[in-house]
Structures are given as C-alpha cells and as structure tokens.
Amino acid sequence: MTSFVAQLDRLTNATTVEDVWSLHVAKMECFGFDRIMYGFTRYRSADSLGDPQDWMLLSTQTPEYMSVFFGEGLYRSAPMIKWAMANDGVCSWRIMSDPDWIASLSCEEKRVVDFNRSMQVTAGYTISFHSLSQRSKGAVSLVAAPDLTQDDIDSVWAEHGDTITVMNNVMHLKLMSLPHVNGRPLTRRQREVLQWVGDGKSVQDTAQLLGLTPATVEKHLRLARETLDVTTTAQGVLKAAFYNQMFLIDGSSVNAQPTQSKVRIS
C-alpha cells in the first residue's frame, strides 16, 4: 500500500472530527504546510457566511492570529476567502506578491495582507471545494512554514499538488459525514425527540414511544430549538441533520472536536 493510499484509508476509516483533523494536519506538515485553517458553512448568502456558531472551523493557527483574524473580523475582507467564495479549485498565493494585484485591493483588504505578513502568513495555497448547494461552501488555507518561500512551496506543488488536492478533498468530504456540534450540543433526549419528529411522529406518538408525557416531549423540543437557535421544530430537525447528530449509532461521539483556538467572533 502506497503512503497516499494509506493516508486515504486512515482518513476514510476515522470516526471523529478530531481523528480526521490530526491525521490531515500531520500529513500536510510533510509537504511543508505547518499551519492549516479549514472552514465550512451551510448558511452562506450573497453578503455573509452565516452565523459563526454554525460554521465548522478548524485551525492550527496561533491563538494570536485567530483572535485578530476572526475576533476582529478581518476574515470579512480577506482576499483569499473572497476568492474561495467565488471560485472552485486551487489558487497559489503567488498572486499576493503581484504589485498590480496589491494596488487593486481596498484599504480593508490591504490591512489583511499586512496583518498576514506580520504573522508570517505569506506563502501557501488555498483550496476551494466544489459545492452543489448555493448556500454551502468549504475551503482550506495551507500556510507554508516561515522558512519556505512561495517559490519553494510552488516547487512542492509542482511535484505533489495533485496528491495534496485529493487528500484535502477526501478530508473535506469525510468531515462532512461526521457528527459535530459547532457549539450547539444536543442532549441524548433532545436528539431522540427530534428523531421521532423527523420520522413524522406527533408529540403524542413520541411521548408514547419514549414513555414520557407530552409536556415533557414539548420541553425537550423547546430546549432543542433553543440549543440549535431555530424558531421551529422543522428547522431544528434540518439543522441537527446538517450537523449529523441524527440517528447516530450507539457509541458515536458528537462531542469530540479538535483542539483549536477559542475565539469570540463578533
């Protein structure tokens, strides 16, 4: 089994977000990418990426970087995020050294570029994943180690770019299949009542099936709606399904998350 196939085998057989992320981070470091930032939203609109609590955001960037980039809202003007939202595929960061391109940026975009330079985020690649939904979008930022130039990482990409792209695509697709909480964890009972409602059962039916009173079922549905930040139970069923928190096999973890910077995003 080649190292490429072995990595895909490990990724596709991983059972938690944490396992997938740690496997992927370790492999990308082998290619010279020592800082990685992955993001996915199902709530994109024309001028927004949706509520940050609804994103899947994984990063090995420093807390200092994350607190400014997300905490101070720089991501809203980040040129490569804008590129990723409008395109599919791969983009080298070589464009960021083009004087004409830099001259075309807004003041807010130039601030992001200057901040990235100050944090040694200057060489790398962005991969924007294809989506069939106009509201969904995922992308990954692969940042080269500080001692590598864009020429260095372009040489790596010339030799291994196809392999790196496929590994990132598989990582993305695997993450989409795993349960995750995004700061909105449901209790076991909340999942149970949502599952029965999702199966078309009424509150009375659900109460009988679970041996509860209708009032208790209503309470758990209300708490589930509050946790998921939705107005209706139908919305709650949809969002829980988006998070892959519905109909879990016993023993599946919905709480395992990669270690990442805790950032308050305004």
Description of each model-found segment:
Residues 1-8, 17, 138-187, 195:
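Juxtadomain coupling helices with adjacent low-complexity linkers
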Residues 116-145, 150:
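Extended hydrophobic
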Residues 220-223:
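Residues within the DNA-recognition helix of helix-turn-helix
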